[in-house]
């Protein structure tokens, strides 16, 4: 996962860590890859330091049920982040939030320091209009070497498809 990280991200993490600032990952990704990323970035407790979309897990089997509990995307990212802050006694106005996505504007509008990272033209214009900080974190190693790709997921109605 580190090969997909923009160079400026590591500098920001180091800066906030040296200042003694608690930082977390807030992503629309599902809980499992989000927690794996948190561990790679050295977060103390991946459970507490990750705000992500959550798929329901069957308590009995430990398997994913296919049901979505939480979506941390768009307005949903604001909602789950606000809940996390309320649970942890954190005021959103004391937070710095870095994003490269226009879908995160609602959360950007509620934090004290919104930062647009490598924004596209639309987010750049929006950030400029509001006087938000705009930064360039460079290009991730993986993106420098190969074109963008997307992921797909197939759901076969909960059945297991495989040999035999």
Give residue spans per PLM region.
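C-terminal cap/substrate-recognition subdomain and adjoining C-terminal extension
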Residues: 1-164
């Amino acid at each position: 996962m580190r090969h997909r990280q923009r160079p400026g991200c590591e500098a920001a993490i180091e800066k906030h860590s040296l200042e003694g600032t608690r930082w977390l990952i807030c992503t629309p990704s599902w809980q499992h890859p989000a927690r794996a990323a948190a561990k790679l970035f050295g977060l103390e407790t991946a459970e507490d330091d990750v705000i992500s979309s959550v798929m329901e897990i069957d308590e009995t089997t430990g398997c994913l049920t296919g049901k979505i509990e939480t979506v941390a995307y768009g307005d949903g990212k604001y909602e789950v982040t606000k809940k996390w802050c309320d649970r942890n006694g954190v005021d959103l106005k004391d937070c710095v939030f870095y994003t490269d996505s226009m879908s995160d504007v609602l959360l950007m509008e509620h934090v004290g320091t919104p930062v647009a990272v490598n924004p596209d033209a639309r987010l750049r214009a929006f950030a400029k209009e509001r006087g938000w900080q705009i930064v360039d974190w460079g290009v991730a190693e993986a993106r420098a070497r190969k074109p963008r790709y997307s992921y797909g997921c197939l759901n076969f109605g909960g059945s297991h498809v495989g040999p035999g």
